[in-house]
């Protein structure tokens, strides 16, 4: 009885982990590679920042199954991506395409960085070239007094 229980404990967890893995039969290695690339490129609609290859959500399982079906029908990668974008929106792509809607996503950070550098350059330039209105200039009497003070200090 103890041996049977020990065997069940040792073999049981391995079977549970094995049952959770999706298995698909591919025609060739190129198709398997395309499937892997597509599932890594597409984001799970339910999960935040997780691709459908790594997600355990039911919708990710459905999307993997759908990609496998479309690959079997002979559709190319762009057709599959277009289908997913039409169905779930641009959010489903980790790297959204450069369009009018996504231009701000691609160029916004660089534009903000450039604007910050320009603002800093203007501030520095204005501080360096601040015009003196003569308020800090010494009058002839003050200059004479300053020279006297400096001369007495050097004589000591």
Swiss-Prot record:
Basic and acidic residues composition-biased segments: 140-156
Signal peptide: 1-19
Any one GO molecular-function label of the UniProt entry: metal ion binding
Transmembrane segments: 104-124
Entry keyword annotation includes Transit peptide: no
Record keywords, A-Z: Cytochrome c-type biogenesis, Heme, Iron, Membrane, Metal-binding, Signal, Transmembrane, Transmembrane helix
Annotated positions binding heme: 44, 47
Superkingdom, natural source: Bacteria
Entry keyword Lipoprotein: no
Subcellular location: Membrane
Stored CDD domains: CcmH_N
Topology in membrane: Single-pass membrane protein
Main subcellular location of this protein, as a coarse class: membrane
Record region (Disordered): 131-156
Cellular component aspect of the GO annotation: plasma membrane
Pfam families linked: CcmH (PF03918)
Entry's Gene Ontology BP terms: cytochrome complex assembly
Family under the similarity heading: Belongs to the CcmH/CycL/Ccl2/NrfF family.
Role this protein plays: Required for the biogenesis of c-type cytochromes. Possible subunit of a heme lyase.
Protein name, entry field: Cytochrome c-type biogenesis protein CcmH
Organism of provenance: Pseudomonas fluorescens
